[in-house]
From Swiss-Prot:
This is Fibulin-5. The lineage of its organism: Eukaryota, Metazoa, Chordata, Craniata, Vertebrata. GO terms for molecular function: calcium ion binding; integrin binding; protein homodimerization activity. Homodimer. Monomer, homodimerizes in presence of Ca(2+). Interacts with ELN. Interacts (via N-terminus) with the integrins ITGAV/ITGB3, ITGAV/ITGB5 and ITGA9/ITGB1. Interacts with FBN1 (via N-terminal domain). Forms a ternary complex with ELN and FBN1. Interacts with EFEMP2 with moderate affinity. Interacts with LOXL1. It comes from the Eukaryota.
Length: 448
């Protein structure tokens, strides 16, 4: 008799029993006797017991008992039970008359299912699927999950539950992405900085080798972490766009790059020398070519080839004017017995020298010295002619010697002829005479 068992099971929850030796009836736990009606009524523990449930638990009254359930995961009651309403008010069986021996009556009473359950056609309490019947109270951001006797509201991925509401989780705060993170409702997306690409895991970034994929540089591409740099070949410099290379004009950097002339070329430069010079192994310095030594001159047999810096000079044989006589290839003498030689220098010696253009000054360029020293004689050195520009002077360095000093830089090409006179004075024999060095100075065109 399964139906009778179910009725007895429910009836036992609120059974009135006579107490031996006491005429008053008693009720089971969770019920209290209503003396006016003589019925056992449910006790609302949620109202009568202080702090029946503590913390985040909520008290739910039931017939003969109460439950504590979490506030954040409420379980809603079925249509046959409402703990917040007054107890069941249907007809209860009358109190049994006192008997000498207990005799439990059979009480006919409707079956009441616990909340979250409902009666099926076979009078069985079955779970109510609140999620399927749309009888839940989950908000649109939540997912309804049916449970035995109730349901729970859960949050979808990307949300977390707070005070009954599903709030978006800001995944970007927790460093889910390696580089750039964009939070969106319920999710997030990772992106990478320029120069990187997103890996298959959707979170980490990998460097893009721009040099291997597109090679944006005109000359040399060097891949770097997250970017690239362009480099230029020697002799070129990188333009402002960081991609193109333009020729570097090395000649404009310094006037001392080459000794003579700097010639710029795409990606390089070279030094050149003027005619009469050759370029040395350092590829910048120029050295004079000795045309006279290499017989690369145009002098005839009567002339003498004199090498200059950057050229040569064909010197004609000297001509001694009257009353002088030529006594060698470079010397003229005025005979003492000739009356015309009384006030003339005794000898004229021809000398040649060259100096570079713009030579630094002061510079000692020529030395003059008496070949014979007579007792009681002294010597005076002076520039007799050719120094109209006051570019030279004679400095006596000893009793019988002097030095020609250049005092001003001279720009070439230029030829200068100086007559340097040495006067001999002898007071013992009352003698005064002189001799002259006719110095021809060739100033080169270049300062080397």
């Amino acid at each position: 008799m399964p139906g009778i068992k179910r009725i007895l099971t429910v009836t036992i929850l609120a059974l009135c029993l006579p107490s031996p030796g006491n005429a008053q009836a008693q009720c089971t736990n969770g019920f209290d006797l209503d003396r006016q009606s003589g019925q056992c009524l449910d006790i609302d523990e949620c109202r009568t017991i202080p702090e029946a449930c503590r913390g985040d638990m909520m008290c739910v009254n039931q017939n003969g008992r109460y439950l504590c359930i979490p506030r954040t995961n409420p379980v809603y009651r079925g249509p046959y039970s409402n703990p917040y309403s007054t107890p069941y008010s249907g007809p209860y069986p009358a109190a049994a008359p006192p008997l000498s021996a207990p005799n439990y009556p059979t009480i006919s009473r409707p079956l009441i299912c616990r909340f979250g359950y409902q009666m099926d056609e076979s009078n069985q309490c079955v779970d109510v699927d609140e999620c399927a019947t749309d009888s839940h109270q989950c908000n649109p951001t939540q997912i309804c999950i049916n449970t035995e006797g109730g349901y729970t509201c859960s949050c979808t991925d990307g949300y977390w539950l707070l005070e009954g509401q599903c709030l978006d989780i800001d995944e970007c705060r927790y460093g889910y992405c390696q580089q750039l993170c964009a939070n969106v409702p319920g999710s997030y997306s990772c992106t990478c900085n320029p120069g990187f690409t997103l890996n298959e895991d959707g979170r980490s970034c990998q460097d893009v080798n721009e040099c291997a994929t597109e090679n944006p540089c005109v000359q040399t591409c060097v891949n770097t972490y997250g970017s690239f740099i362009c480099r230029c070949d020697p002799g070129y410099e990188l333009e402002e766009d960081g991609v193109h290379c333009s020729d570097m004009d090395e000649c404009s950097f310094s006037e001392f790059l080459c000794q003579h002339e700097c010639v710029n070329q795409p990606g390089t430069y070279f030094c050149s020398c003027p005619p009469g010079y050759i370029l040395l192994d350092d590829n910048r310095s120029c050295q004079d070519i000795n045309e006279c030594e290499h017989r690369n001159h145009t002098c005839n047999l009567q002339q003498t080839c004199y090498n200059l810096q950057g050229g040569f000079k064909c010197i004609d044989p000297i001509r001694c004017e009257e009353p002088y006589l030529r006594i060698s290839d470079n010397r003229c003498m005025c005979p003492a017995e000739n009356p015309g030689c009384r006030d003339q220098p005794f000898t004229i010696l021809y000398r040649d020298m060259d100096v570079v253009s713009g030579r630094s000054v002061p510079a000692d360029i020529f030395q003059m010295q008496a070949t014979t020293r007579y007792p009681g004689a002294y010597y005076i050195f002076q520039i007799k002619s050719g120094n109209e520009g006051r570019e030279f002077y004679m400095r006596q360095t000893g009793p019988i010697s002097a030095t020609l000093v250049m005092t001003r830089p001279i720009k070439g090409p230029r030829e200068i002829q100086l007559d340097l006179e040495m006067i001999t004075v002898n007071t013992v024999i009352n003698f005064r005479g002189s001799s002259v060095i006719r110095l021809r100075i060739y100033v080169s065109q270049y300062p080397f």
